[in-house]
């Protein structure tokens, strides 16, 4: 079989180490070879008539010429579906990494492995492991059409990646698409507001309103869960996985989890001022969830970057209720300054 890989990042490099293939990437200017003897070619050199299977790097946009010319697209997940052990897929807008790490911790003693968008490509995961726990992006789900998990955990969805998907509706539909493929005997946990949009399905659906509702659904004692929002919801979903798959609630094991770097890391300086590093909060919803605990303080908020085409009006409507000053940076700085001015929010460009 003539296999073509699109892109040459972490995921495709791991795959190229396992299969004979030809790799196409925009950064290649001329043909060369990788360490395994695979051809490395410029994207323009791709000929669909000389390829039987095309596996795209998840981040390549659907409008890229390689995708438009491909005739046999297959996602990383679909390619490994025949050898994939029972799996938990974790998706949503925010909290995927933390929830995936927490869930893997709860199943680590039995040899469960974590991977996917969290950093370890499927090509590097042992297919003989009893369980894969995969952080799963909307990009991967967009290209996946056959693979399905034993348990799908969907965190809340808000406007994000519109520039990649073309619209929020397309982004949301990618997140929900896997449910249609899940067979009887599998389970999907999802936000209740998405229930009316779920496609025809055979799996069990468990819908939650918020953290309090999650705790009630699974009989979880939140007093034994040592995390505050937004990490509380992540922890409850990890415990829900343990409850569904093993009928257990390993509170003490969960309590040993340490929140990762750049996620609401707090430090006091010599003058007693609180600095919060929340640089993993890369979209509007994450910012909105981080601020309420500081409602009674004067906030200096550094904000900016690629907003991925999201509607930022709800963010600025909420920010207007805080005592704060914005410090705008990044590619959308002009847009942020205009919105701040419109909502009478002090800012420094």
Language model features with spans:
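Short, basic phosphate-binding NTP loop
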Residues: 1-89, 265
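Residue-level signal for inorganic ion chemistry
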Residues: 19, 54, 90, 103, ...
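Walker A (P-loop) phosphate-binding motif
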Residues: 76-117
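Conserved substrate/cofactor phosphate-moiety recognition/catalytic segment
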Residues: 112-128
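Nucleotide phosphate-binding/pyrophosphate-handling subdomain across enzymes
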Residues: 224-324
């Amino acid at each position: 079989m003539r296999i073509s890989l699109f892109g040459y990042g972490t995921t495709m490099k791991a795959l190229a180490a396992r299969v004979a293939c030809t790799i196409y990437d925009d950064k290649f200017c001329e043909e060369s070879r990788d360490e395994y003897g695979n051809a490395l070619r410029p994207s323009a050199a791709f000929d669909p008539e000389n390829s039987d299977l095309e596996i795209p790097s998840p981040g390549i946009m659907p409008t890229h010429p390689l995708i438009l010319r491909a005739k046999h697209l297959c996602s990383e997940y679909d390619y490994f579906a025949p050898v994939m052990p029972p799996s938990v897929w974790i998706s949503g807008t925010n909290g995927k990494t933390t929830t995936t790490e927490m869930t893997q911790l709860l199943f680590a003693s039995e040899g469960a492995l974590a991977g996917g968008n969290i950093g370890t490509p499927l090509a590097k995961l042992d297919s003989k492991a009893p369980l894969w726990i995969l952080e799963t992006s909307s990009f991967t789900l967009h290209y996946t059409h056959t693979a399905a998990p034993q348990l799908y955990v969907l965190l809340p969805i808000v406007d994000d990646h519109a520039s990649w998907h073309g619209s929020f509706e397309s982004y949301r539909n990618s997140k929900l698409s896997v449910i249609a493929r899940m067979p009887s005997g599998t389970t999907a946990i999802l936000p209740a507001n998405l229930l009316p949009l779920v496609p025809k399905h055979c799996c069990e659906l468990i819908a939650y309103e918020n953290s309090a509702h999650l705790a009630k659904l699974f009989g979880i004692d939140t007093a034994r869960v040592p995390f505050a929002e937004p990490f509380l919801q992540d922890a409850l979903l990890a415990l829900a996985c343990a409850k569904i798959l093993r009928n257990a609630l390993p509170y003490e094991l969960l309590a040993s989890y340490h929140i990762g770097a750049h996620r609401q890391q707090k430090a006091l300086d010599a003058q007693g001022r609180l600095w919060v590093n929340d640089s993993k909060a890369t979209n509007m919803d994450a910012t909105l969830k981080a601020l309420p605990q500081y409602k009674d303080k004067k906030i200096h908020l550094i904000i900016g970057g690629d907003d991925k085409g999201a509607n930022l009006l709800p963010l600025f409507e909420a920010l207007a209720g805080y005592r704060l000053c914005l410090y705008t940076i990044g590619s959308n700085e002009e847009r942020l300054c205009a919105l701040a001015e419109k909502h009478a929010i002090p800012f420094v460009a």
